[in-house]
Regions:
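Extracytoplasmic mature domains of secreted/periplasmic and thylakoid-lumen proteins
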Residues: 207-208
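Blade/loop signatures of beta-propeller domains
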Residues: 20-84
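Short, solvent-exposed loop/turn elements at domain surfaces
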Residues: 57, 63-69, 93-97, 116, ...
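Bacterial N-terminal signal peptides
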Residues: 4-14
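Aromatic-lined ligand-binding clefts that engage carbohydrates, nucleic acids, or primary amines
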Residues: 106-107, 172-173
Length: 535
């Protein structure tokens, strides 16, 4: 591994709240077609949402984005008995989100813009909300806070003492493909507020918003990277950012950019089209919260102009209070065909020694352990655990108390040459405890070349780690030795609870959600619910 890390300390790059409009014109993403009402409405109305301890709330289940479920209500020995319990079909095509499960309710976004609240046991529909454009984030559920009791004359206090204080509703927070963030009433599905965090035409919220202490932390990504090779596109002007929103109103409290300078005209390309810069450093993952140090961590993407900036291809720490940049560790990797950017969330983990480490994997296939107390200094890992020079860590890793589990996607640009693999690493040293190559069955939908890349986010529970593959198979591996415990091919057609024709396919982006004995996964336009023996 060739690596030239750079530590840069910079002052505040926060933007005042008044500089960010709350509700500007709608974004430019494709508007979904009108969807039919769901046919499987629950027989009874939903109760208010009670936020408990055993749940999967948001992207990583906890603030540290470990993607670890310590209380799955499934024993590792019963994982081979998992069977399909029910399926639900999304209207409007394939979906790439991840279910959130709180209080026996599943909350799910969709690429068609419909947001769902389903009963986790039966798959019936409590409510839907149709956003004007698609969403692919996980949903975070949180209480908006308790309203204050109005001033009451002393002589009436005893009379009214039995009355409960009226509480604000719990809310479901998510982002969409135009850079907007929403809050819905989690019980009823009605819109509470909408806030436009970024107005760039290519802005989108790819990383799930993270809720902490009455603030919603939102990272902003983009699809402008797709146009960098287009000579007719005036490239590039998008800058990545992270923002803090007030959960009660959606007001932007601060916003910090990952490219410090505003883009300016640079030159005209061979087609005579004006080009711009600097730009890039999009954030495609969910922020990780470090309450102890008062910061959040994000991983950034590459420069879209070919000129590296101080925060491109980096892990960066921003202050939770005001968005000031605390430190940044740039991790450019030379000699790799794939990007050195980060699209998966950093994982904050406590070692057996009591010290903490930031675990980060990038598209290059290189993984790192960084010291949160010393500006992201690289821990003494041999070769930085360069597990696979063919690439790459895509959407998310997982960590329990013993190991860090990293799935590698291989080169998606080479059909039939993407084997994929799952690695268990020592989070202290980066040494591999085991690794298992992805099995290579033929894909159900084709006899031709088939990718077995493992780009989907990983999920771990005691004794078992779940990793999906582009071949459509969801597999559970032993956390001890990496042996495959269970294998389910999702690339098939399913009978659904709501009567929508649903078919699975390649597994990508959002990973498995495990709560109360159930395993939930999205494949194609199907949401699949598994339990032991399908009961």
């Amino acid at each position: 591994m060739k690596c030239a890390p750079l530590l840069v300390l910079i002052g505040s790059i926060a933007v005042a709240a008044q500089d960010v409009p709350s509700v500007p014109p709608a974004g430019t993403a494709r508007l979904p077609a009108a969807l039919a009402p769901e046919k499987n409405l629950c027989a009874s109305r939903a109760d208010p949402v009670a936020i408990g301890s055993v749940q999967w709330n948001g992207w990583g289940r906890d603030l540290f984005n470990t993607r670890y479920q310590p209380e799955p209500a499934i024993r590792a020995m019963d994982v081979p008995k998992l069977g399909l319990k029910w399926a639900f079909g999304f209207q409007g095509g394939s979906d790439f989100g991840q279910p959130t499960l709180v209080d026996d309710r599943l909350f799910v976004t969709s690429s068609a813009g419909r947001i769902y609240a389903l009963d986790a046991k039966s798959g019936c529909t409590y409510w839907t909300y149709d956003a004007p454009t698609g969403s692919r984030t996980a949903i975070s559920i949180g209480e908006l806070g308790q309203s204050k009791r109005a001033a009451i004359p002393r002589k009436l206090k005893r009379t009214l003492a039995h009355l409960d204080v009226i509480k604000a509703p719990s809310a479901a927070f998510f982002g969409d493909d135009t850079g907007a963030v929403y809050a819905l009433d989690a019980q009823k599905g009605t819109l509470l507020w909408k806030s436009q965090v970024d107005t760039h035409p290519t802005a989108r919220i790819l990383g799930s918003p993270t809720l902490y202490n009455d603030r919603l932390y939102v990272a902003v990504g983009s699809n402008e990277d797709d146009n960098t090779g287009n000579p007719n596109y005036s490239c590039c002007t998008f800058r990545g950012s992270v923002a803090a929103l007030d959960i009660a109103s959606g007001r932007v409290l601060w916003k910090s950019y990952t490219v410090l300078e505003e883009p300016q005209p640079t030159h005209k390309n061979s087609a005579g089209v004006q080009e711009w810069g600097p730009a890039g450093a999009a954030i495609a993952s969910s922020p990780t919260i470090d309450a102890k140090r008062g910061v959040l961590y994000v991983g950034t993407g590459r420069s879209t102009t070919g000129i590296e900036q101080s925060l491109t291809d980096s892990i960066a720490a921003f202050a939770l209070s005001d968005g000031k940049l605390r430190w940044v560790k740039q991790l450019n990797v030379s000699g790799h065909a794939t990007s050195s950017g980060f699209t998966s969330s950093p994982v904050l983990r406590t070692l057996t020694s009591g010290n903490e480490v930031i675990l980060a994997g990038q598209h290059s296939g290189v993984v790192y352990g960084l010291d949160p107390d010393h500006g992201g200094e690289i821990q003494g890992w041999p070769g930085a655990a360069d597990a696979n020079s063919d690439g790459g860590v895509a959407w998310g890793s997982a960590a329990d108390h013993r190991s860090w589990y990293v799935a590698l996607s291989g080169s998606l640009a080479l059909p039939g040459n993407s084997s994929g693999s799952l690695w268990a690493l020592d989070p202290k040293t980066g040494v591999a405890r085991w690794h298992t190559q992805s099995p290579t069955p033929a894909c159900s939908w084709s006899e031709g070349p088939c990718s077995h890349a493992q780009s989907q986010a990983v999920t771990v529970m005691p004794g078992g780690v779940f990793s999906g593959s582009m071949d459509g198979h969801l597999r559970a591996y032993s956390t001890i030795d990496g042996k495959v415990l269970w294998d389910f091919d999702t690339a098939k057609t399913f009978q659904t609870q709501n009567g929508v024709r649903a078919s699975g396919g390649p597994l990508d982006h959002g990973g498995a959600t495990i709560v109360n004995g159930g395993v939930y996964i999205i494949s194609g336009n199907a949401l699949l619910a598994f339990s032991v023996d399908g009961k």
